[in-house]
Amino acid sequence: MSRTRIVIGISTAVGVAAALGVMAAPTAGAQAHGHDGRFTVVADHLNNPRGLSPAPGGGLYLAEAGRGGKPCVSGGPEGETCAGLSGSFDLITKGGHVKRIITGLISASGPGGVAAIGPVSVSRGPRGTFYGLFGLNTHVIPPKGAIPDNVRTKALAQLGRLWLVKPGAWVKTVSNVGDQDWAWTKRHSDLGPTDWPDANPNAVLFSHGSRYVADAGANALVRVKWNGNARVLHYLAMPANFEGDSVATCVARGPDGALYVGELLGGFYSPEHARIWRVTAHHATVWAGGLTTVQGCGFGSDGAFYATEFQTDGLTAQNPAGDVVRISQNGERTRLGVGKLFQPSGFAAGPDGSIYVSNCSIAPATGMGPQLCPTGGQVVRLG
C-alpha cells in the first residue's frame, strides 16, 4: 500500500476517536511490561512534527511536515488534498525554543492540516550541518493548473529530495532519492505490491560517512552515494499470506555497527506484526518481531534499542494511543509513555540517558480537538 494513503488515511480514524473520546491506554503485549518514567513536553504547538536528530549544544533538529495549505483539490485519500508551503526544518534549543531554520517548504495534508506530508526526517551531519529529507516523489504531483504554480514549482523541487543544510541555512540538493526509488520499484514490480511503482522516503541517517534512507513506499533500505545515486541495499520482503506492505519507516546504527530498519506493518494491519531488520554488508535478518506500527527507532546511550509505536492497537484501530518499546541488550522489553503518547513518530537519544519523541505527530499546531492533542504536535522527553 502507498505510504501516502496509509498516513493520511489514519486521520479518518483519528477524527472518529476524538469524537468518541477514545483515549484508552494501549493494550500491552505479554512480552513487555510498562514503566511510567518522567514525561516532559519540550515543545508544542508544532505542525505535524516527524523526524528528530540530536543537534550541537544539546538541542534537537526537527522536521515539521507542515499543515498543508489552500486550495484543496480533489483526489486525495480523504477526497481532498490541501497543498501549501507550511513545512519547515527546525532547531529546538536545549531550553525548548523552536527556531525554524528553513520555512516555506512543501506540505500536503488532508482538510484541517491533519496528517501532512512534506519534510519528514533529519539527521545530524558533519561540521554543523544536517540532512533534511522530504517524503513522496514527483510522480504524485498534480498537473499544471490543479494547484498554484508556486506550490507546484516547490513540489517539483522538493518532494522526494534529500538536502544537506549548512550553517546559515545554505541548502544543497544531494539526491532525488524518491524519484530514483520510484524508478527502481517500476523495474522490480514483480517484487512488490500491486500499487507499485511507488516511493516515499521516510527516514534519513548519516552514519560512518554514509547516507541511508528508509523508503516506506519502496519497502527498502537505500544508500545514497556521494554522486547522488540511490542504491537499494535491502528490500524488506513481505511474509507469506501478507495483507499489506512491510513499509520501511526508520533506520539506525547499532553499537555492533549493523544497521537496524523498522517497519510500520510487517505485511499485516493487525497488531504485533512489525519487524526490526538487522542489515550488514552481507545479509539481512529479522532481529526482532512482535511490534506494532513502528515509526521511529534508534539506540540509547545505554545500548538499548527503542522503537516508537504509532498506534499500539494497530493502524486501523480507532484508539490513537501509542508508546515507545525499549528492548534491552538481554532482550527484555519495556513500554514507555503508556497513556501519554498519541501517534508518536520520530526518535532521538540524548547523551544523558533521556529519549526524545515527536508526539501527536499528525496534528497541526492547533490540535485535533479538545480531547486529542489540544496543543498540537509536540516533542517530549522521556526519562
Residue spans for each PLM region:
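Extracellular beta-propeller repeat domains
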Residues: G29-G383
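Secretory targeting and sorting signals
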Residues: M1-Q31
